[in-house]
Amino acid sequence: MRCKICPRRCNAERTAEKAGGVCRMPAGLVVARAMLHMWEEPVLSGKNGAGCIFFSGCNLGCVFCQNGRISHENFGKVITPAHLREIMEDLVSQGAHCIDLVTPTHFTPWVLEALEKPLGAPVVWNSGGYERVETLRTLEGKVQIYLPDLKYAMERPARELSAAPDYFEAAAAAIDEMVRQVGAYQIGD
């Protein structure tokens, strides 16, 4: 496939055998870790933890990344959408309060395959906020919570630290789309 998933629209050739683009990932899914995670935001972790699935690679490549080994060193295992679904269902059966998809943007088409049927727990899209509105629209009805980490409001640091001078423009439009889909942030029981 020629990739246009994220705002970079890099048109990289991504096949099962060939990784490409800024994310340096092949077509298909690469997962670094899946686990019950007690240390996400408390409203996501609940009492049993969030079912976190950490995807490999990233469409931003920030120099300050807290998950650098996962994001920059291509650490992880290639899996199918069916296997991702099994992982999600297993985390739900372990009592996960939600399924927290961490840095999933560059794998959107394959994540969508895994989310074809309802899961029985809310799905969290935990990203760097650097998203295309068109890509987010494909997630409508599949994702219940968006958790974008808004990183920059100014072009210069976005360019210098993530090579994404259009970051704020793309992220602002993406957040508007996220709110359109699921509504504004609310805390309840």
Located regions from the model:
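A general structural signal for well-ordered alpha-helical packing
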Residues: 136, 140, 168-175
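Alpha-helix N-cap and loop-to-helix initiation/capping positions
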Residues: 79, 162-170
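Auxiliary Fe-S-binding modules of radical SAM enzymes
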Residues: 1-19, 183-189
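Conserved Radical SAM active-site core
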Residues: 19, 24-146, 154-156
